UniProtKB/Swiss-Prot annotation:
Protein name (Swiss-Prot/TrEMBL): Mitochondrial holo-[acyl-carrier-protein] synthase
Name of the coding gene: PPT2
Keyword tags: Fatty acid biosynthesis, Fatty acid metabolism, Lipid biosynthesis, Lipid metabolism, Mitochondrion, Transferase
Organism: Eremothecium gossypii (strain ATCC 10895 / CBS 109.51 / FGSC 9923 / NRRL Y-1056) (Yeast)
A GO CC term attached to the entry: mitochondrion
Enzyme Commission numbers on file: 2.7.8.7
Family designation: Belongs to the P-Pant transferase superfamily. AcpS family.
Transmembrane parts of this sequence: none
Length: 174
């Protein structure tokens, strides 16, 4: 599916984006609040818990977050949604992918998801990076109220990206 990309750069249209996958996750905030009550920030239990699904950048950011529960829930939901957007037989285990990506804010405060290729390489999943993630990006939306936080991820590629099966078809037809 090709989606027109209406953002303009100067007077040039940036082209189209192709949706490769979508994912969403919903977190019940009282559950996260209770979890963090039992594992307060700075404790060994919290460090072990965060190390299971947070990138080093997120672990550092968690210590300074004004609202720990919202921060942790936002990171968790974003990664669950990302995993659903890239799900497939060749995907690495969820925990590996969770530790290899990180949620951060862009220059104007919008949430973004980045993938650390070095983390995937150290975990032995460079092929997944090369075939499924390189040349793509993740669009992230996070919303919350008192009791719930939801994250939506759209995995997109520009018109130059070729998935492995497309590269094989092009090679066979050449």
């Amino acid at each position: 599916m090709l989606v027109p990309h209406d953002r303009m750069v100067g007077n040039k249209r940036r082209g189209t984006m192709r949706v490769l996958g979508i994912g969403t996750d919903l977190v019940y905030m009282p559950r996260v609040v209770e979890l963090l009550r039992r594992m307060p920030a700075g404790s060994g239990a919290h460090a072990r818990f965060a190390g299971k699904f947070m990138h080093a950048r997120e672990r550092a950011g968690a210590l300074g977050a004004k609202d720990q529960a919202r921060y942790v829930a936002g990171v968790w939901a974003a990664k669950e949604a990302l995993y659903k957007a890239v799900a497939g037989a060749d995907a690495p285990p969820a925990a590996t992918l969770y530790r290899a990506c990180y949620k951060e804010a862009d220059a104007v405060g919008r949430p973004t998801l980045q993938v650390d290729a070095g983390e995937l390489q150290r975990a032995g999943h460079m092929r997944f990076w090369e075939e499924r993630l390189a040349g793509t990006r993740f669009l992230l939306s996070v919303s919350h109220d008192e009791d719930y936080l939801v994250a939506f991820v759209c995995h997109v590629a520009d018109e130059t990206f070729r998935a492995p099966d497309e590269r094989q078809r092009i090679t066979k037809n050449s």
